[in-house]
């Protein structure tokens, strides 16, 4: 793990928080493409569970200057957002008025202020993976 932290820590699109490493190479895709990319790399989509993790993802998001996908969604049960492992979200950072499910929005994007918005899963957003 120490070698991974050293390698990723030197990368532009990488941040380390505790035992987690967040990484992006600037690739964008829809939610399913992002999920597949992160899973195929041995990780999962970035899914902040506290403010420090959210800030790490925000730094990467802002380096690329585009909205980023987060791993949480309410695809299974509308209005019940969950982490990729199926557990309920324990940390919330919704933008005011969100989630609002405007237009069948089941996925979550991060704005440039670190706040979250529910978003249509078919839109393209920055892919950030968590290891």
Regions found by a protein language model. Give the residues of each.
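Surface-exposed ligand-recognition segments of extracellular binding domains, strongest
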Residues: 66-105, 111-115
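Conserved helix-loop-beta core of C-type lectin(-like) domains
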Residues: 15-17, 32-87, 127
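Intrinsic disorder
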Residues: 25-28, 48-51, 102, 123
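Eukaryotic intrinsically disordered and solvent-exposed regulatory patches
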Residues: 56-57, 114-116
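Intrinsically disordered, low-complexity regulatory regions enriched in Ser/Pro/Gly/Thr
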Residues: 9, 13-16, 37-39, 61-64, ...
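Extracellular disulfide-stabilized recognition modules
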Residues: 1-43, 112
């Amino acid at each position: 793990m120490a070698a991974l932290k050293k390698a990723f820590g030197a990368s532009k699109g990488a941040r380390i928080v505790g035992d987690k490493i967040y990484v992006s190479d600037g690739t964008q895709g829809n939610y399913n493409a992002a999920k597949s990319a992160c899973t195929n790399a041995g990780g999962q989509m970035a899914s902040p569970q506290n403010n420090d993790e959210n800030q790490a993802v925000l730094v990467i998001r802002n380096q690329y200057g585009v909205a980023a996908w987060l791993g949480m969604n309410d695809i299974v049960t509308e209005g019940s957002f969950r982490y990729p492992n199926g557990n309920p979200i324990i940390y919330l950072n919704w933008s005011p008025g969100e989630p609002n499910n405007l237009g069948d929005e089941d996925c979550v994007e991060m704005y440039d202020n670190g706040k979250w918005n529910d978003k249509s899963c078919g839109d393209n957003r920055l892919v950030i993976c968590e290891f």
